[in-house]
């Protein structure tokens, strides 16, 4: 009996992997679009002070925390898949050149690439942790 239990435990992955579905992840995608495209638009309309606040507060602090939190919640509820972190990074990548003003085009392009990679890493790690937590809670 104990050998059968060991075999069944080996077949189950540590991190449950699921298929990506737009229907199940639409709330996360809509929240990300609001966070990365609508909220920055309000700060851009506020003038120079709003843009400075947007650059310092949103780009470096609030956006990575939002990405990590939404990835964690998604991982707990849906499990892990590779497509969700990629969608989060793509949605964020589009907003950086649109709302964040930089002095030179090269600086803007480099910041866009770096922040896209950072957001993808945050989302990937949070989704993996969320899926692991999901697995622990179901045991």
Task: Report the location of each language-model feature.
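Membrane-helix boundary connector in multi-pass membrane proteins
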Residues: 96-118
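Membrane-helix boundary elements
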Residues: 21-54
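Alpha-helical transmembrane segments of polytopic membrane proteins
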Residues: 53-67, 112-124
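Canonical alpha-helical transmembrane segments
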Residues: 62-81
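Membrane-water interface at the C-terminal end of transmembrane alpha helices
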Residues: 22-31, 121-139
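N-terminal juxtamembrane cytosolic/stromal segments of multi-pass membrane proteins
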Residues: 1-24
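Cytoplasmic-side transmembrane-helix entry/capping segments in multi-pass membrane proteins
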Residues: 81-90
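Aromatic-anchored segments of alpha-helical transmembrane domains
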Residues: 33-42, 89-100
